[in-house]
A protein has these predicted regions:
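A structural boundary/capping signal
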Residues: 2, 36-239
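Bacterial N-terminal signal peptides that target proteins for export
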Residues: 3-24
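N-terminal regions of proteins, emphasizing targeting and processing segments when present
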Residues: 7, 33-35
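Bacterial N-terminal signal peptides
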Residues: 23-33
Length: 239
């Protein structure tokens, strides 16, 4: 029988699977950001772990987003057809279309960061090993604009809006970081544009161009094309 792979059925060594499960559960513990360390984010293919479809919650969000966004066509064409919460989206997407890449990124970062911050609701399930895992719910752009969300929802909303502006999936990643100063995990968006320019967008309107915030350690990244586990290269004593 053809079974769509889930997080705990990936055909990877046990250590990599444990790292992936840990990274996914980390998304539940998001904090507001800290300040800048000296290593830029690198769009490296060496940490590739799996196709993005292996993470069902992420894949399901992308499917819901496509359906919901298709239903917004009337609103995007005519502001009068928008619901109250979608009017601002119409304005931003309409005005931002003709802007250069740098200004589109700044516009989206500011727009999304004004939205309501809500902690994600936790769901506890058992995997085949009998251990409890805590998956995170991924909100679509429409769901986020209607209800707010936590750090990964802010980051995903930016990702989806920039995709509408024509940014390639391969040039963006939702990145989970560990904030050593807060002793918690957080999500940011890495964006590559104009060749090799890379910016990291945070939830406090900061944009890191060449340096990441002090104490941030990259753990995990995802986009429409795949999942990257940055943590597998780190010596155990540094984790």
């Amino acid at each position: 029988m053809n079974v769509r792979p889930g997080l705990t059925t990936l055909a990877h060594p046990d250590g990599m699977r444990r790292t992936l499960r840990r990274a996914l559960s980390m998304l539940m513990v998001c904090v507001l950001p800290a300040a800048a360390n000296a290593v830029p984010y690198v769009f490296d293919s060496g940490d590739f772990l799996a196709e993005s479809s292996a993470w069902e919650a992420w894949a399901d969000m992308l499917t819901r987003h496509a359906t919901q966004f298709d239903g917004l066509k009337g609103c995007l064409d005519d502001k009068a057809a928008c619901t109250r919460r979608m009017r601002s989206l119409h304005v931003v997407l309409s005005q931002g279309t003709a802007l250069p890449r740098e200004k589109q990124i700044r516009l989206v970062n500011r727009y999304v960061n004004r939205k309501r911050y809500n902690e994600d609701r936790r769901k506890i399930i058992r995997n085949e090993e009998g251990k409890l895992t805590i998956p995170s719910h991924w909100a679509t752009l429409v769901e986020f604009l209607e209800k707010g969300g936590d750090c990964e929802d802010f980051t995903t909303a930016k990702y989806l809006m920039l995709r509408h502006f024509g940014f390639a999936a391969e040039d963006m990643r939702v990145v989970v970081v560990y904030d050593r100063s807060q002793r918690a995990h957080h999500a940011v968006l890495a964006v590559r544009f104009d060749g090799e320019t890379i910016w990291v967008l945070d939830t406090d309107n900061r944009i890191y161009r060449k340096r990441r915030p002090l104490g941030y350690r990259y753990v995990y990244a995802v986009n429409e094309l795949g999942i990257w586990d940055h943590d597998i290269r780190l010596p155990r004593r540094r984790r």
